[in-house]
Amino acid sequence: MASPLSTTALSLALLTVITSACASDTDKRSQAEAGRAPKLSAVTSFQIRSEILDDERTIHVMSSPDVFLNDETQFFIAQDGRLFFDETTTFQGQSLELSATLKELSTLSKTANLAVVAVNSANQSGQGFLDNTKRYAEYFPKNAIDFIDNPLERLGYRLIVDRKKNNYARFVVEELIPTLESEFQIDLNQSNLGIVGMSMGGLIGLSLMLEHPDIFGSSIGLSTHWTGINFTDYLLLPIRGYIGPSDSTAQALIAYFEQFKSQMSRKTVYVDYGDLGLDAYYEPYVMRLKKILETDDSRLCVLKFENEGHEPQYWRKRLASALSWVQHGDIRCS
């Protein structure tokens, strides 16, 4: 299958964003022969035209300082790409300041050989009702819909969520990953590829790892949104400004994840949550999911953070330690 990434668009993006950091074509070839791709010292941004999503997505790639990308680099595909860099069009006008996180990791007494591939979500405006609906539809695991007991709720998910243009998981596996492998001269698989997300981004991340265990070896979810949405609240959201959880959706997600317990072999999963706002609903479901995800030969970290909620300011504080734990197992999880 031909790469969905336009060669012209990528060339222009590379020349515009990181001209000084990229080698010449000749240097690229020699580096490839030596088993390493060009070093990135800034954010590389380019666009992919997705046939699956029928949309164009901006991709941002950033690595730790002084790291040459190769098969030894730990790559993380991250949802809600704008949230990592641009506070002007993100939830609550805040960003995770990824560059500061990577610098923090590089100063630790260990190698932080990692790169983050941040994919912009369908939420172009950062706050629009329709944009948020499409983002939710893309990030909700499609195969979990079968486990929703309420027939009306299940029908709603079938009509709104389960559509070809909302299949973000297929986009990641069939379009994004082959593009990254081609551009950066790498082979991505469970030994060097993880996935990270916040809220709904954490939900689709765990789903991707479990449905594609040969591709993803780790998953990081910060304040993963386990409880879905109450459809009545959601339809009235523009008026009421409030949205509550759906226990039936949460139960469906637990049943969906339970079928993958055998896929947890040799997997690494980080899950955290707070006790404010939406996060206050999560603990009962997290405890049940912990029993599903915990196996003899898996690595699982589940952490609760007191007085923290469903906001980027809290995720920003926790991102570095989550990434470091996946690579080095250097924080206490209890």
Predicted regions and their residues:
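Non-catalytic cap/lid and distal C-terminal segments of serine-dependent acyl enzymes
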Residues: T26-S334
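Sec-dependent N-terminal signal peptides
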Residues: T8-T16
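Detector for intrinsically disordered, low-structure N-terminal pre-sequences
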Residues: M1, T16-V17
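Bacterial N-terminal signal peptides that target proteins for export
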Residues: M1-A9
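C-terminal motif of bacterial Sec signal peptides marking the signal peptidase cleavage site
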Residues: S20-A21
